[in-house]
Structures are given as structure tokens and as C-alpha cells.
Amino acid sequence: MKRATHRLMAILVLGLFALQASAQNKAYMFGIGNTNLLDTYLSPQNYHGLDLRYISHRISEKDSTHLQHRQLFMGEVSLTKPRSEDGKEISGMVYYSYGWLWPIMNTTIANGKFRMHAGGAIDFMLGFIYNTRNGNNPAQAKIALNLSPVINADYHIPNTKLVVNYEASAPLVGLLFSPNYGQSYYEIFSRGDYDHNIVPTTIGTTPTLRHLLTLDFPLLKKTFRIGYMGDYQQAKVNNLKYHARTHSFVIGMVF
């Protein structure tokens, strides 16, 4: 009798665990593209060149509620030069985003399953830009913390194993580190001259958008992902302008 009771309890526990289980989707991608870079703290010129990035995109979804926990990690390097080709700018950035998305649509379109989730995320960015021409103030630090609305959708093409995915996010409010116009890093860190260097931001001062359109397809018993990433980072604070507008082709695998 005790053994039967223990078995029943084990079955109930396993059943409860199954109800709370999460479906996970992990994608690892590499991107290559072209970027347009401007940072008026370093130079009034636009710089154009190659952008390379690594992207880790993870979604864990509760089976019972379909609530999604989303993580995005991205490392990026770029090498750019102006039209005059006198000098270069080298940049490196790391991004991390963690968010929660709730289901807002689950329907069938043309016999294919279509789902949409929406929510918000906490985003962190850390990086640098280095200008090879500048003797004074040759580098610029990039540090930002944002709250961003996020939306994603997926469509399963009927009678195939193809899945189209789309995701977009844009920072709504946040904090941004920036020197003021004409202020050196020596003044900030050695002399301690604070001059509005931690700047509250809104969508008006940092009109930024990152979106990703991909296609998942099976090949050799694996699932691959190809697509396009548009990443448009912009800011106008402390009488300084910055933008990094990048178009990338991405390719990777889904697990």
C-alpha cells in the first residue's frame, strides 16, 4: 500500500512539474554588415565600414501561461573610416537585455499558426569608440541603461517546418553616460568636475530601434536560422550627437 501511495505521489509531482515546464528556444548567430557611425565628441564626420557581431537569443516560455522570459546578449566590433579616408574609428560594444513578454495573439493565418507576444525589457550597453587621428580625447566611452518595450511574433508556414520570426525593441526611458560638449575625460575622472554626465533619456533624446527578421529551416537534422538585423542607435545629449546605424545579415543555429 505504501509503495502504491509513493508511486501515486511521484506521478502527481511529475505531473505538476510538467505543467510548470518551460519550452526553450536558443539561437546563436553571427552577423556581418555595414555601419554608419557618427560621434561628434570625436569627429564631425560620418564614418562607414564593416560591422561584425555575435548574437545569443534565448526565449523560455511557460507552458501553462505562455509567459516568455527573453534574454539577448550581443557583442559587436566595427572598423570604419570617413570619405576622406584620413584616419579610422574602431568601436566595440556589448549589449545585454532581459525581458518579460505576455501573449497577446494566438491564431491561424492561411492555415499557419501565428503568435505574438509583447512586454518590456531592461537593457544594458557598455562599449567604446576609438579615433586613430585624435591626439586629445581619442576615445569615447558608451554606457547606457534603458527600459524598453519589446514585441515579437512567429509564424509557422503551413505544411512545412519553416518558421518566420520577428522581434523589435526601442528604449523608452533610461540613463546615459556622456561627457559634455568640450569636456575632457581628464576633467571628469581626475579633477572630478561633474557636468551633467549622467543624463536621463527618453525616446525623444535617444530615438533608437533594433529589429530582427529571421527564417528557421531544417537541414541535416539541425535547425538553422538566417535573416536581417537592423540596429539604429541614436542619441542627442549635452550638445553632442551620436548614431550607429547598422544593417546586418545574420546566420546561425537554433537549439
Task: Name each model feature, range by range.
Residues 32-38, 75-81, 122-130, 168-174, ...:
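Transmembrane beta-strands of outer-membrane beta-barrel pores
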Residues 46-53, 88-96, 114, 139-149, ...:
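Residues that define the transmembrane beta-barrel architecture of outer-membrane proteins
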Residues 24-25, 59-70, 104-116, 158-164, ...:
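Short loop/turn motifs that connect adjacent beta-strands in outer-membrane beta-barrel proteins
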Residues 1-27, 255:
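Bacterial Sec-dependent N-terminal signal peptides
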Residues 50-62, 96-106, 120, 147-155, ...:
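Residues on the lipid-exposed face of transmembrane beta-strands in outer-membrane beta-barrel proteins
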Residues 37-46, 80-89, 134-140, 197-201, ...:
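Extracellular loop and loop/strand-boundary signature of outer-membrane beta-barrel proteins
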Residues 136-221:
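Outer-membrane beta-barrel transmembrane domain signature
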Residues 23-80:
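Short glycine/proline- and aromatic-enriched beta-strand/turn motifs that initiate or cap beta-hairpins
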